[in-house]
Amino acid sequence: MGLSWTVPLEWGKNHSTTNPLGFFPDHQLDPAFRANTRNPDWDHNPNKDHWTEANKVGVGAFGPGFTPPHGGLLGWSPQAQGMLKTLPADPPPASTNRQSGRQPTPITPPLRDTHPQAMQWNSTTFHQALQDPRVRGLYFPAGGSSSGTVNPVPTTASLISSIFSRIGDPAPNMEGITSGFLGPLLVLQAGFFLLTKILTIPQSLDSWWTSLNFLGGAPVCLGQNSQSPTSNHSPTSCPPICPGYRWMCLRRFIIFLFILLLCLIFLLVLLGYQGMLPVCPLIPGSSTTSTGPCRTCTTLAQGTSMFPSCCCSKPSDGNCTCIPIPSSWAFGKFLWEWASARFSWLSLLVPFVQWFAGLSPTVWLSVIWMMWYWGPSLYNILSPFIPLLPIFFCLWVYI
């Protein structure tokens, strides 16, 4: 018993082809003709492909041998077959405006025309609109009353000021902003200037140091006649290949240590003058201070002082006695008393210092004249230290 099956005629109107379902390659999927539907327009499609041409291999946008000459699945149009044609666009019409270039910006209308609501802050309608909590939240900071009632506004100026505090002042105070930036910029510029000057101190002192070895002549590096000859140069600027380079580095290292020691001495003198150093003067009748195991004061210092006190004596009962730090020259007095206790010959200098301090004005004028006469040479010696004077002055004022 054999089975037979026939294709219903309703599957397609073009019954002359062997593919009644209309998927490929003889039926179009172009929506313009509603392919694979019951629309009888398919039979009237002049661009439908023929089965005999479907066996031909064509070249399209997808490579050789992949796109048949008929439209295939994408349709029969040239764009669907990958053959895109660029048509020249029509030139734009000639402008009737004879003026070229950017036209001027029109004048902005006044505020009363563009934003009439902004001119009605004093009106009754504006105050009535503020009764709405949603409108009130736009003009007053968060956290205010949201019950729908508006607190009585004393003046219109306060209302406008509160609105500006919410949305920002349209004309900020640029003077305060400028002064806030100008101060740090000036400090930064002054600090950079002092830094550049301070960096020249080692080289200046190095030049002065080496000039002591070449009295009456120009300083010349002695390493140029050694095993590694170099061109004539100053001993303060030796290249790394010069044998004098290591001596130049050693001299500048000593100079840096000397400058640091000088700054430390000045800082200690300044702190000692202001009474901020925990230095105790010697107790009368004792040669040294006793600060060994004594850590805390059981007997407070006499009087009140804003500066810290120190434990200077240790009586036999084991209690420490706190002595307040002197208000001025504590460090200098401590060093002098410490040196006098160990070097007795320093006490012989006291009368000379007292005599020098009691000289007549005539002697002081003579000293000033001598300094004026020898001033240029002293200036050449002390000029490298001039950049340190502003730093010492700032420390003296602000500490």
UniProtKB/Swiss-Prot annotation:
Domain notes: The large envelope protein is synthesized with the pre-S region at the cytosolic side of the endoplasmic reticulum and, hence will be within the virion after budding. Therefore the pre-S region is not N-glycosylated. Later a post-translational translocation of N-terminal pre-S and TM1 domains occur in about 50% of proteins at the virion surface. These molecules change their topology by an unknown mechanism, resulting in exposure of pre-S region at virion surface.
HAMAP family: HBV_HBSAG
Region spans: Pre-S1: 2-118
Protein origin, superkingdom: Viruses
Keywords: Acetylation, Caveolin-mediated endocytosis of virus by host, Fusion of virus membrane with host endosomal membrane, Fusion of virus membrane with host membrane, Glycoprotein, Host-virus interaction, Lipoprotein, Membrane, Myristate, Transmembrane, Transmembrane helix, Viral attachment to host cell, Viral envelope protein, Viral penetration into host cytoplasm, Virion, Virus endocytosis by host, Virus entry into host cell
Major localization class: virion
Family: Belongs to the orthohepadnavirus major surface antigen family.
A GO BP annotation: virion attachment to host cell
Residue ranges annotated as Intravirion topological domain: 2-252, 202-252, 369-374
Protein name: Large envelope protein
One Pfam family named in its UniProt record: vMSA
Covalent lipid adducts (N-myristoyl glycine), residues: G2
Side of membrane Virion surface, spans: 2-180, 274-347, 398-399
Post-translational events: Isoform M is N-terminally acetylated by host at a ratio of 90%, and N-glycosylated by host at the pre-S2 region. Myristoylated.
Gene (name only): S
InterPro entries: HBV_HBSAG (IPR000349)
Region: Pre-S2, residue numbers: 119-173
Disordered as annotated region, ranges: 85-109
